[in-house]
Regions:
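Active-site proximal loop and beta-alpha junction motif in alpha/beta enzyme cores
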Residues: 1-70, 76-146
Length: 146
């Protein structure tokens, strides 16, 4: 099987700057083990895998060691691949992910991402955090991703 892999530097207009992410468009997701192996081979913070679903895309992200529920820079990189390479001229794309639908729109100023808001709540301070900081934090908060 041959499929392109794009490496995109997100959050920059300069080459070799920003945050790199790999983007791999596919016709269908391969097994989790294969996706994980591809991400490990890329050895970037995240590799995004996208599959068309109607006019939208399914989107998953893997680090070199695990799948993650949400990744901003790899979503932005995926949108750039869709709008600049796969469907030139397209100005909005919706990705369906483990975190729900994510919309990215291209404007004259750049890309705008609409991401879910996750409520945070105070949690007990982990002893190892206080030890590492050398002080007791005023407050520690977590959300659904912690």
């Amino acid at each position: 099987m041959r499929t392109p892999i794009f490496q995109v530097d997100a959050f920059t207009t300069r080459r070799f700057a920003g945050i790199p992410a790999a983007v791999m468009p596919m016709n269908g997701f391969l097994t989790d083990a294969v996706l994980q192996a591809v991400a490990a081979e890329n050895n970037l913070a995240e590799t995004a895998f996208l599959v068309p679903q109607g006019s939208d895309y399914l989107l998953r992200w893997f680090t070199p060691t695990t799948e993650v529920p949400l990744c901003g820079h790899a979503t932005l990189a995926s949108a750039a691949v869709v709008m600049e390479r796969l469907e030139p001229g397209r100005s909005t794309v919706v990705f369906h992910s483990a975190s729900g639908p994510l919309t990215v729109t291209r404007t004259t100023l750049g890309y705008v991402m609409d991401f879910p808001a996750r409520a945070s709540a105070a949690v007990p301070t982990p002893p190892e955090l206080a030890a590492a900081l050398g002080a007791e934090p005023i407050e520690v908060v977590a959300n659904a991703f912690n």
